[in-house]
Amino acid sequence: MEVNLLQYEKKYHNYIVAGVDEAGRGSLVGPVVASAVIIDKADIIPGIKDSKKLSKNKREILYERITSNYVWSTAIIAHTEIDNINILEATKKACAIAVANLSLKPQKILVDGNMKFSDIRFISIINGDNLSLSIAAASIIAKVTRDRLMLELSAEFPQYLWHKNYGYGTREHIEAIKTHGLSSYHRRSFKSC
C-alpha cells in the first residue's frame, strides 16, 4: 500500500510546515548534514520519497528540482565538532541551524526520528522520511549534499574508498583504517575509529 506522504502536511495545513532530515549521523567520517525544506503544496514534485529508496541519479535529479522550486536550507556540522559535543547534539544543532536559515519561518517543523527539541515547533516523527513529503525532500537534499562532500574528501584520501562507502563502516573501510590508520576527517569519538 502506498503511504500518503502528505498526511502530516495536510494535518498542519493552516501552518507553514518545514521538513527536516539529516545525513551522515552513522558515518565514521566527515560532517553531519541537516536540511530543511518547505514544500509548495500547490506544486508537488513527483517522485519525492526517502532518499535511501532512490538511485543516485534520481536523487540528483530531484535535488535540482527541489532546490529550484522550494524554500530550503542546509547546515553542516564538522567532524571535529561532532567529537566535541557528540553526534546526537551535533545532529540537533544542524537541524536547528538549517531551520533558522530558511528564508521563510516555519510554524511547524517535522523532523525525522525521535530526537527531542526544546523548541515546541519541532515534531519528531519516527520513520518520517517515509511519512512526510517535506521530510523526504529534506532527506534528498541532505544526502546529496553530504555525498558530494564525501566525494571531494575521497579525492584527498582515496585509500578509504569514500567514493563508494561515503564514510560508513563497510568492511573495506574498516580494513583501510587498519592498514592506513585514521585520516584527519575520521571522527575520533566513534568506537569503530
Curated annotation (Swiss-Prot):
Coiled coil: none annotated. Its main location: cytoplasm. GO terms for molecular function: manganese ion binding; RNA binding; RNA-DNA hybrid ribonuclease activity. Keywords: Cytoplasm, Endonuclease, Hydrolase, Manganese, Metal-binding, Nuclease. It catalyses: Endonucleolytic cleavage to 5'-phosphomonoester. A divalent metal cation binds at residues 21-22, 112. GO terms for cellular component: cytoplasm; ribonuclease H2 complex. Its cofactor is Mn(2+); Mg(2+). Manganese or magnesium. Binds 1 divalent metal ion per monomer in the absence of substrate. May bind a second metal ion after substrate binding. The keyword Metal-binding applies. Residues 15-193 form the RNase H type-2 domain. The keyword Manganese applies. InterPro entries: RNase_HII, RNase_HII/HIII, RNase_HII/HIII_dom, RNaseH-like_sf, RNaseH_sf. One of its GO terms (biological process) is DNA replication, removal of RNA primer. PROSITE patterns: RNASE_H_2 (PS51975). It comes from the Bacteria. Its EC number is 3.1.26.4. It holds the Pfam family RNase_HII. Endonuclease that specifically degrades the RNA of RNA-DNA hybrids. Belongs to the RNase HII family. This is Ribonuclease HII. It comes from Rickettsia prowazekii (strain Madrid E). The gene is rnhB.
